Amino acid sequence: MHCTVFFLLIACAKSSYGQTRSVSTAKSESKSDEYSYNSDAIDQSRLLRGAVNPVSENMALRKFIFDMPEMLRPEHFEPIFINPAAVKEVIKDYLAYGEALCGSGYDPRLLALFGVRPTVLKQELMKAKGVTLSVMPSSRKRPRALDEVESEVENFRNVLKDFFIPPTTTNPSKLIPDDIETLVPEHVSAHFNSLVYLMYFAVLHFDSQELATMSSSVLLKYALQKNLLLREKIESGTLGEWERDFRLMRVLNVYKSEQT
C-alpha cells in the first residue's frame, strides 16, 4: 500500500515537473523569439506612430551629422535621430562657428537658419540633401559650450528687440529711426548688418513670414544701400509673385521710392 502511494507520488511529481518544464521552455523560447525580432518590431511600431523619423529622413540627417563630425557636440549624435527638435539644438551649436552671429563674412543661408522652427528646419535639411554643407563658415574653430551659444543667441534676440520693432496694424511704417546707425554702438553694427542678409534671404525665397518682421521702410532702404544682390533680386522678381502678398508689395513700393 505504502509502495503504491509512493510510486504514485513519484509519477505525479514527474508529470508536474515535465509540464512545468515544458511551459517554462515554451515561455523561454517564446521570449527568445520575441527578443529576436523585438528591435524591428519596436522600430516599425514607432514608425507607424510617428515616434521616429521615416528612414529616408533619418538617412539625410545622418549625412548632415556625419559629414561634419568635428563640428558637432557628441551628445547630439543620437538624439537627432529620435527627436526632430534636436536638429535645432545642433544648429545652435553650428551657428557658433566663424562667429556667424556677430562677425562678417557669413553666408545668408546660414543666418537664415537662426530661429527657424524645428519642423521647418528639418524640411530644409531634407531638401538640401548635402548642399547644406556649403553654408559652413571656413573657420573651423572648436565648438563653444552650448550654454555660451544659447547666451549669444539670446543676446542677438535682445539686440533685435532693442533696435527693431516688428510691424503692427496700428504702426506699419515708422519702425526704425532714420538715424539708427548713430544710435547703435559700433560693436552691434554687425548684428544690424545681419538683418540685411536675412532680408535678402527672405526676398530671395519670397518668404512673407520673414518679410513681415523685417520689411520696414527704414530697414529696407538701409538694405538696398548696402546690398546690391538685394536690388538685383527685387528687379528680377515677376510682378505676379509680388502682387500675391501685400508684404512683398510693401518691399517693392519702398524699392521704387528709393529709385526716385
Swiss-Prot record:
Signal peptide positions (record): 1-18
Keywords recorded for this protein, A-Z: Host nucleus, Secreted, Signal
Disulfide bonds: none
CC per GO annotation: extracellular region; host cell nucleus
Keyword Electron transport carried by entry: no
Subcellular location, record wording: Secreted; Host nucleus
Motif Nuclear localuization signal (NLS) per UniProt: ranges: 136-148
Motif range (RxLR): 46-49
Biological role: Secreted effector that triggers a robust hypersensitive response (HR) in Lactuca serriola LS102. The response to BLN06 was visible as strong necrosis. Although effector recognition is frequently associated with single dominant R gene loci, the recognition of BLR38 requires 2 unlinked loci that display incomplete dominance.
Domain note: Has the canonical translocation motif RxLR, but lacks the canonical EER motif, which characterizes most oomycete effectors identified so far.
Family: Belongs to the RxLR effector family.
Protein name: RxLR effector protein BLR38
Naturally occurring in which organism (per UniProt): Bremia lactucae
Taxonomic placement: Eukaryota, Sar, Stramenopiles, Oomycota, Peronosporales
